[in-house]
């Protein structure tokens, strides 16, 4: 794809897919990698870079304020890019690809999961009532309300998302 301003300035973009972006988020069951799932080894071995699916694994991190940088790049489906991808994300995509009307639609799978975290960390600032911090759900990592949302969800708002799959234990 070439974009030009009408003069001598142009930008060439290669390997572009236009399709549906799905976000997968939640706790440890969503975080479970494809390599750990029944049928995962076979799915990983069968992956080829010409599949019309791209994956984006958001780094596990927090922030006190909303961030704009994702800190990761879209990757082709290969045996190297899939082992730690959410198994739920992969099998969901596989299920979508079985529908005849969706077989030609490229898919973007965003894995933004973090096991052992409380729901409050994934909730935008100001959406929770003012409650004492001692009443908030515990987190294995001591993550504060909105801190996961700020770092692992807000940067994704640049994408038009088809849907979100949430898996809270």
Residue ranges and their predicted role:
Residues 1-169:
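Cell-envelope and extracellular/periplasmic
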């Amino acid at each position: 794809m070439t974009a030009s301003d009408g003069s001598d300035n142009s930008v060439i973009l290669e390997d572009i897919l236009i399709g549906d972006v799905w976000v997968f988020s939640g706790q440890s069951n969503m975080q479970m990698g494809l390599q750990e799932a029944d049928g995962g080894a076979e799915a990983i071995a069968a992956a080829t870079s010409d599949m019309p699916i791209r994956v984006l694994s958001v780094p596990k991190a927090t922030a006190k304020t909303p961030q704009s940088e994702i800190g990761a790049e879209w990757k082709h489906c290969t045996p190297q890019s899939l082992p730690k991808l959410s198994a739920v994300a992969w099998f969901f995509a596989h299920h979508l690809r079985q529908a005849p009307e969706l077989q030609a639609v490229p898919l973007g799978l965003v894995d933004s999961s973090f096991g052992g975290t409380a729901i409050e960390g994934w909730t935008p600032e100001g959406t929770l009532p003012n409650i004492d911090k001692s009443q908030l759900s515990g987190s294995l990592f001591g993550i504060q309300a909105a801190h996961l949302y700020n770092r692992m969800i807000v940067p994704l708002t640049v994408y038009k998302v088809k849907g979100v799959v949430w898996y809270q234990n």
